[in-house]
Amino acid sequence: MELITQKIRQCIEKVKDMSQVGFDRDYVIKDNKPDVSKVVCQNGQVKIDEIKASGENIWLSGSIEFEVLYTREEVFEGDEPEENIGGNRVEHIKDAIPFQEKLVLQGVCEKDTVRVYTGLDELTVGVINSRKLSVRGIISVELYGEREENLEVAQRIDDKDVEQLMGQMKVLKLDSAVRDIVRIKNVVTLPKTKPNICKLISSLVDMRNLEYTYERDHITLTGECHACIVYLSEEQEICCFEVQEGFSNEIRCEGDNAGNIAWLRTQPAMHQVEAENDYDGELRQLSIEAALAVDGKVWSEETVEVLNDMYSVSCPVKPVFEKMKVCSLLMKNDTKCRILEQLYRENSKKRILRICGTKTQATIAQIKNADTGIIVSGVLQVNCVNIVEDDGCPIEMHTDSVPFEQFVEIPGMDANTCCEVNVQVDQVQVNLLDNSEYEIKGVVSINAIALQQDEVSVITSVEQEKTSSDTEEEAALVGYIVQKDDKMWDIAKRYRTTVENIMEINALTSDSIKPDDRLIIARM
């Protein structure tokens, strides 16, 4: 008696957690850099180099990559002319501070896969003394513990003497797990209104309006690489240049069904900006390189035939059931959250003359369940580079955190629903209303996918059943009154006959029965 089965590749989420990690490090300025007077601008990002899982202990190893623009304490005779700006010297530091952090993710084991997503929620660089900086910040961490496994579903028994109750089950089959690095490179030329580049001072790079589509054997990732460049001109003026270039990259993956379901997460991996000569030999071109770490999955939604129950009228056998988790798609929902906020710089003594550019990031603070979906709360972080009224150093950067909240509709959620949410910036515009008041307009894209992980009983094998000496079962002919919740299949199985035999004896045209119906059953 052979059991015919089908294996279905699944990825089961076991546990997830969201937490924050604080860091506080001292940074000693290298000997080739002058003393610091004041920090003007700072920005950074988190880079994860290695993830090690030992039971429930997760070790993260990486670094905080940061950039600092500062003014030096004094200007000495003999300094290069391009290094003097309005009586102060502007210096740039780009470095990384390594870190290792231990986190606990309860419920995972050695065989599980751990996914980690990080973001830099806050970064503050302060001056301790002329040779030392304090670098403080908060890292947000998303942890997902999951296991890839094969669900073996019984589809039929290759035996004509066995009665089989067939059914259907919707499953989400994992076709491909995607993990790749997407590299982006653009070469842009300064507008004619901008002077030539003497030295790059700072660069802020981020990705916006990211979208992806699945097309049979690949995922197409499109978006816009946004960069704000601060440089020193040949006339010793600080200049800013903002550029936004579109890109499109293909990520190869398994699967040949155009209707497959894709889910993709991206994280910034690196960026680099260099000044290059144009065709005339002038330093008027910028080479902008960036990389995105891509992680995701491709599923196909299938309806498979399953064997729900079986018995034999000729020999005493019974199915062996085992409880397993079956993954299915509940909903994939993408929504937009529009943000409008007016802000006032109360404590600033410098008047803003012009906003040069921005760097943005959207992070999730909390996800709460609602009646028919979830409420996503987060923060839109905007770093603004400004030209200010200051002859000593006419550039500064300030960071604003604008909260947002959006309801995402996911009807049918219950305790077995696993929901993953990704937020990213589509558009941001900062308008200067006066010298101290400005307006932030933005659009944040919120992508949510809800998977249902229900526990079901599936047949895994067939074994011999002990024979019963019950007199009712030994009787050749039985009269039976249908009880509440009775089904024709259960009655036929109990008395070792067939549904067709009961219908024929009782002159029934269907297997539909109701309580108090009277049936004559002939045991086979």
Feature names for model-found ranges:
Residues 467-504, 509-524:
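Primarily a LysM-type cell-wall glycan-binding module
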